[in-house]
Amino acid sequence: MSSPMKYQSQDKFEHQTIEQSVVQRLQAAITQGHLVPGQKLVYSEIAEDMNVSVTPVREAMKTLQALGLVTIRPHRTAFVSYLTEDQVEQLYALRTLLEGLATQRTVERITDAEISHLKQVYEEMDGVVEVLNRVANDIVRSEGIVSLQRLHNDFHSSLYASCGNQYLDQTIRLLRSQVATYWPVINRYSIQRVNKSHSQHFGILSACEQHKPLVTARLMRTHLQETVPWIIEHIRTGHPQAGEAEARGMRDITTTEEFRFRQDAELAVSEDEK
């Protein structure tokens, strides 16, 4: 099932307990797409790969189950969590509602320092996306997707953390963890998906800069809703194909189309919504 290269080095987690280290290393392997939805997790193999006993692996699985990343079945059989199409639609309906609300509340009170941070994260994402569009090397692309995922999480987390409601923020974090296993796989196979998502981040950032909470919330809801067909396509076929996703309501992004999307976003933030 696994190889030692699949997990991050123990050295990175040297100040943690063994169980915490196992949790973090497994979580990274899952959210970065090295372990994919539905994949069986064999405790003894993981313990051997990480050079630990089975006990901390077993305890780590319980933590990951609470985060929604792992499903444990009778007789201690564990799998990377996966969702049905109906579950994806239900989960994203709730995410769209809550994350739209959190975004609106954040933009209503956002500070210059917080906007500056979002701009910095976006600019870093811009650099990664540029590389992904230029380079065909699988290793470089894989590393780029990992970097983009980290920045993507930072961008979204920063938008929700300042919403003024810790329970709303915590609930969003839990819901986002439920689909974290799908983020790398739906982006790894389609640069069109990466480009469209990045363009939507541009619109969201522009609305934040102009202090347009309702516009920002609307753009965030659109951003989330348009992720659903890609995840469902992965569930149906194993990985999303741009043409197939397009047939279910998505469209590829060419340079011209991306420019038009950005224009639309800029027009949106110039409306009279406050």
Where on the chain are the PLM-derived regions?
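Short linear motifs at protein or domain termini
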Residues: 1-108, 233-242, 248-274
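Short amphipathic alpha-helical segments at helix-loop
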Residues: 6-11, 38, 83, 136-140, ...
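C-terminal all-alpha effector/ligand-binding and dimerization domain
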Residues: 14, 180-274
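Amphipathic alpha-helical repeat elements characteristic of tetratricopeptide repeat
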Residues: 20, 96, 119, 195-199
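Juxtamembrane/interface motifs at transmembrane-helix termini
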Residues: 58-59, 110-112, 134-140, 189-192, ...
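Alpha-helix N-cap/N′ positions at the starts of helices
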Residues: 75, 98, 151, 196-199
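Conserved amphipathic alpha-helical segments that form helical-bundle/coiled-coil interaction surfaces
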Residues: 86, 112-184, 198-210, 214-229
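Short helix-capping/hinge motifs at transmembrane helix termini and TM-loop junctions
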Residues: 107-108, 164, 188
